A protein has these predicted regions:
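Active-site activation/catalytic loop segments of kinase-like enzymes and analogous catalytic loops
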Residues: 217-249, 259-278, 291-303, 307, ...
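Short, solvent-exposed loop/turn elements at beta->coil junctions and helix N-caps
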Residues: 27-32, 253-254
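Active-site acidic catalytic loop and adjacent metal/ATP-binding pocket
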Residues: 31-47, 51-52, 170-220, 232
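ATP-binding pocket architecture of kinase catalytic cores
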Residues: 30-147, 152-163, 178-180
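A general structural signal marking secondary-structure boundaries and capping sites
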Residues: 19, 75, 114-125, 176, ...
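An alpha-helical support segment within catalytic cores of ATP-dependent transferases
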Residues: 4-24, 122-188, 199, 235, ...
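Short glycine- and hydrophobic/aromatic-rich loop-to-beta-strand nucleating segment
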Residues: 88-92, 190, 227
Length: 344
């Protein structure tokens, strides 16, 4: 049996309470769902597959399970069959027949899905240090200060580029004000295509571990960075999300959150997940749109260090390009003027 020994009794209890059996007919570990002390299995009971999630960490999964259950009840996530906070185990329906998700369809389906998600009753909040979305960088205090200092000390980026990253972070954090009206139920892990499954009819959001009440633009920007490749794409994407053409303020806030996300994934993958491996900056970075296309289709997986470094670099290069555009300065101006009157 592949279940960790310390979790076997809890899994047996889960199967018994949910299905009236003490063992699954089949069980197979899912590699791309297993990470960060979480193990995910496809289990078959009486001919029907389900997803068994076993959390090996010690933190309380109440927020995770609460958000996942709310999304499932709304038809945005697979049906939840069982959760146990103390045992840190969940069983949900297994999304069968997932197929490649064409970008053209995603431009319409994903923002509609996010609009439905954000229409749900408010999700629980989460302590700032447990925020694993890009809005972590918009916080203030010793945790973010320590991370920025660590990034500077590790010197993964060339010195002048590290100064640029810190300056752009400070600029964005000073302008992008938190607003109560912009907080909404959020998935917070949509930079990965594996968390948006398309079965040919419906789109399902899976892996709710990072979910909480967050800035609505965080999910919107993270997903867009994979699938929006032109101004025309952006018009479609934002139009579907807002239900009409976005105004200048909405476009500005969206664009700035995209830049926050670029900084976040630069830091996460070049600095925190590179394993200390030296980066050869003489080698050109991959093309951003090509990399994201291959990432979206599953051709690229962020499992090995070289892929993680390449991912961080394409985000960094895209940020450097975007901050030189007139739109960046205009977006800063629009949000700065609005922020004067709307801060918490």
């Amino acid at each position: 049996m592949m279940i960790p020994e310390e979790k076997r009794a809890a899994v047996t209890k889960a199967l018994s309470e949910t299905f009236g059996v003490t063992a699954a007919d089949e069980i197979r570990q899912i590699s791309n769902g297993t990470f960060n002390k979480v193990q995910v299995f496809r289990v078959v009971v009486r001919g029907t597959p389900y997803l068994l999630r076993v959390i090996l960490r010690t933190e309380d999964p109440t927020c995770h399970f609460t958000c996942m259950s709310a999304a499932a009840e709304a038809g945005l996530a697979p049906r939840v069959r069982y959760t146990n906070v103390e045992d840190r185990i969940s069983i949900t329906d297994f999304v069968q027949g997932a197929i490649p998700f064409p970008r053209a369809e995603a431009l319409v389906r994903v923002p509609r899905l996010l609009r439905s998600l954000q229409a749900l009753p408010a999700f629980p909040g989460r302590a700032g240090h447990l925020n694993t979305s890009c809005t972590f960088l918009l916080q203030k205090g010793p945790v973010i200060d320590g991370l920025l200092q660590r990034c500077k000390t590790m010197a993964v980026l060339p010195h002048d580029q590290m100064d640029e990253l810190l300056a752009r972070h400070a600029q964005l954090a000073s302008v992008y004000a938190p607003q109560a009206a912009e907080m909404a139920p959020s998935h917070n892990d949509l930079f990965k295509p594996d968390n948006m499954l398309f079965d040919g009819q419906r789109t399902w959001l899976v892996d709710w571990e990072a979910a909480f009440q967050n800035d609505r633009y965080a999910d919107l920007a993270a997903a867009a960075n994979m699938i929006v490749t032109s101004d025309a794409d952006e018009d479609i994407y934002l139009g579907e999300f807002f239900g009409q053409a976005p105004d200048a303020y909405q476009r500005a806030r969206f664009f700035l959150m995209q830049q926050v996300a670029h900084i976040f994934y630069t830091m996460a993958f070049l600095i925190l997940q590179s394993g200390g491996q030296r980066i050869d900056w003489r080698e050109p970075a991959a093309d951003y749109d090509d990399f994201q296309q291959r990432f979206w289709t599953g051709e690229i997986k962020l499992e090995e260090t070289p892929a993680k470094i390449a991912y961080g670099r394409v985000h960094w290069e895209r940020l450097l390009r975007n901050v030189q555009s007139p739109r960046y300065e205009e977006s800063l101006r629009i949000c700065a003027n609005t922020a004067r009157y709307t801060r918490f």
